[in-house]
């Protein structure tokens, strides 16, 4: 029992120093605050999913991508995908493309 309390105190101290110790708790200034933030964020997404149903929620995500594809046209959407596919945790797709000499035609990104 004491070890669990000590662990919570350690996590709380890290949270007070600005570290995220609970997934989804980004921005919380204490362990408890991060727990509440994470719970609220999770519940927010789930509430929307419950309102729309699983199919509707999936369709909403699909529609967002389709709308963007229609705005940019097929070529622009594919070009953006190429750039996004090059990104890593420490470098953006644009940085990697530049380093590796891969041409990305950003003029195709323009909304029609």
From Swiss-Prot:
<feature type="region of interest" description="Disordered">
    <location>
        <begin position="1"/>
        <end position="112"/>
    </location>
</feature>
<dbReference type="GO" id="GO:0009737">
    <property type="term" value="P:response to abscisic acid"/>
</dbReference>
<dbReference type="InterPro" id="IPR022377">
    <property type="entry name" value="Sm_Hydphi_plant_seed_CS"/>
</dbReference>
<feature type="compositionally biased region" description="Basic and acidic residues">
    <location>
        <begin position="32"/>
        <end position="42"/>
    </location>
</feature>
<comment type="similarity">
    <text>Belongs to the small hydrophilic plant seed protein family.</text>
</comment>
<protein>
    <recommendedName>
        <fullName>Protein SLE1</fullName>
    </recommendedName>
</protein>
<feature type="compositionally biased region" description="Basic and acidic residues">
    <location>
        <begin position="56"/>
        <end position="82"/>
    </location>
</feature>
<dbReference type="InterPro" id="IPR000389">
    <property type="entry name" value="Small_hydrophilic_seed_prot"/>
</dbReference>
<dbReference type="Pfam" id="PF00477">
    <property type="entry name" value="LEA_5"/>
</dbReference>
<feature type="compositionally biased region" description="Polar residues">
    <location>
        <begin position="44"/>
        <end position="53"/>
    </location>
</feature>
<feature type="compositionally biased region" description="Basic and acidic residues">
    <location>
        <begin position="7"/>
        <end position="17"/>
    </location>
</feature>
<dbReference type="InterPro" id="IPR038956">
    <property type="entry name" value="LEA_5"/>
</dbReference>
């Amino acid at each position: 029992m004491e070890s669990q309390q000590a662990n919570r105190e350690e996590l709380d101290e890290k949270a007070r120093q600005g570290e995220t110790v609970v997934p989804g708790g980004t921005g919380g200034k204490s362990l408890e605050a991060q727990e509440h933030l994470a719970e609220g964020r999770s519940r927010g997404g789930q509430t929307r999913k419950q309102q729309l149903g699983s199919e509707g929620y999936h369709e909403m995500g699909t529609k967002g991508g389709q709308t963007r594809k229609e705005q940019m046209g097929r070529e622009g959407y594919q070009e953006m995908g190429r750039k996004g596919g090059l990104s890593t945790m420490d470098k953006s797709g644009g940085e990697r493309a530049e380093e590796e000499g891969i041409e990305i035609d950003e003029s195709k990104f323009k909304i029609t």
